[in-house]
Amino acid sequence: MSASLAILTIGIVPMQEVLPLLTEYIDEDNISHHSLLGKLSREEVMAEYAPEAGEDTILTLLNDNQLAHVSRRKVERDLQGVVEVLDNQGYDVILLMSTANISSMTARNTIFLEPSRILPPLVSSIVEDHQVGVIVPVEEMLPVQAQKWQILQKSPVFSLGNPIHDSEQKIIDAGKELLAKGADVIMLDCLGFHQRHRDLLQKQLDVPVLLSNVLIARLAAELLV
């Protein structure tokens, strides 16, 4: 029987960019995508997941192509419920595709991949003592990103570049800003960044560029071979 993969997302993720990374190894018919908020309107999302005063939040992309702050507690609660359903359905691997710092969910039977738990040590082992620069889509994500990459030998440097709303030149300028700050490896840790952004930056800046969704997708694919 062919291996099966369930991709779980919080909001909107460009699956057309992710699937080619996986279909080299697994038939597309054996891949399913499940989004917690992706099919809901902004009004429906905020009615169910609006954060209470002082509550920890997650920043996610909704189907109006705009970001929203939602309650971490409510999202993690309902994501765990979806994981349990998928686990009971017999998937071989469940892949959570999110750059949010979520690492508290469990699955009883299937392999469950949480990027926030797996990627930081993986990237740290790849870059060793090189200076990493991270392009962050919005300023609000800077504290979360700084916390996420604490494991690196050298504290990362940051610049702002939004893959959804900014031009290619703005993304290149964000990369140049990182080089000026001493970076010799660039990290794109946002699901809006695609292979074309990585290729663009590598060509223009001549430094290695790591793309988080490529790293986690390839890891998932290896587990399915």
From Swiss-Prot:
GO MF terms here are: racemase and epimerase activity, acting on amino acids and derivatives
- Kindly give the Pfam families that the UniProt entry links to this protein: AroM
InterPro entries noted in UniProt = Asp/Glu_race, Uncharacterised_AroM
Protein function:
This protein of unknown function is encoded by a gene that cotranscribes with the aroL gene, which codes for shikimate kinase II.
Cross-referenced NCBIfam families, in alphabetical order? PRK10481.1
Q: What is this protein called?
A: Protein AroM
Question: Which species expresses this protein natively?
Answer: Escherichia coli (strain K12)
